[in-house]
Amino acid sequence: MARKYFVAANWKCNGTLESIKSLTNSFNNLDFDPSKLDVVVFPVSVHYDHTRKLLQSKFSTGIQNVSKFGNGSYTGEVSAEIAKDLNIEYVIIGHFERRKYFHETDEDVREKLQASLKNNLKAVVCFGESLEQREQNKTIEVITKQVKAFVDLIDNFDNVILAYEPLWAIGTGKTATPEQAQLVHKEIRKIVKDTCGEKQANQIRILYGGSVNTENCSSLIQQEDIDGFLVGNASLKESFVDIIKSAM
């Protein structure tokens, strides 16, 4: 079945009011049909309102993290309830950097997704293997464990997007070849099929998120089971529009 392509800009902990204004101006100049392509920008949370006001309505926006806790005495957290109240549409869950620096676990990812879905937020859920795990031929074993930790929670497979992040390729300039990425994406779809059913596996979108740039995006997007990108550093440049174009 034809799945709607999805391109996400994860700005991580970057940006100023002025740089965001310049970047969104260049994004707005790109003409695309949002009924055929989802483009979602994830700024730093405190820049969310500024970014949303600057971007044209054809773009969607989200935040890079959400709390597994509800409202209450959780200093520094942003609950799914608050995100919903602010009309935030998307959240990123389980990004490699959250797992690495903030020690988030598969159980944390599950609880965050549960809170997000309860509040009708759409989620990009990330997972992937380390270089050591890849070299030990444990890629599929690791990814199966990560995906099965949360996939049973999904009831609307249009509202949850999977993002495969080979950890060894994030911010390193290295990237999986299109063939390597496709092989893993195919296995991810099989995991969803075995757990949830064939219809759901064919419906869910799976993004690639390992050092995507203007040089490799066109060959990656041609792969059957790659439905778009989660882009980090390259989304902070005006040339990000060329990555979007590869999915048009």
Curated annotation (Swiss-Prot):
PROSITE patterns: TIM_1 (PS00171), TIM_2 (PS51440). It comes from the Eukaryota. Belongs to the triosephosphate isomerase family. The lineage of its organism: Eukaryota, Sar, Alveolata, Apicomplexa, Aconoidasida. Changing F96Y: 5-fold decrease in substrate affinity. It catalyses: D-glyceraldehyde 3-phosphate = dihydroxyacetone phosphate. Changing F96W: 3-fold decrease in substrate affinity. One of its GO terms (biological process) is glycerol catabolic process. Keywords: Gluconeogenesis, Glycolysis, Isomerase. GO terms for molecular function: identical protein binding; triose-phosphate isomerase activity. The keyword Isomerase applies. The active site is at H95, E165. Catalyzes the interconversion of glyceraldehyde 3-phosphate and dihydroxyacetone phosphate in the glycolytic and gluconeogenic pathways. HAMAP family: TIM_B. GO terms for cellular component: cytosol. InterPro entries: Aldolase_TIM (IPR013785), TIM_sf (IPR035990), TrioseP_Isoase_bac/euk (IPR022896), Triosephosphate_isomerase (IPR000652), Triosephosphate_isomerase_AS (IPR020861). Changing F96A: 2-fold decrease in substrate affinity. This is Triosephosphate isomerase. D-glyceraldehyde 3-phosphate binds at N10, K12, G171, L230, G232, N233.
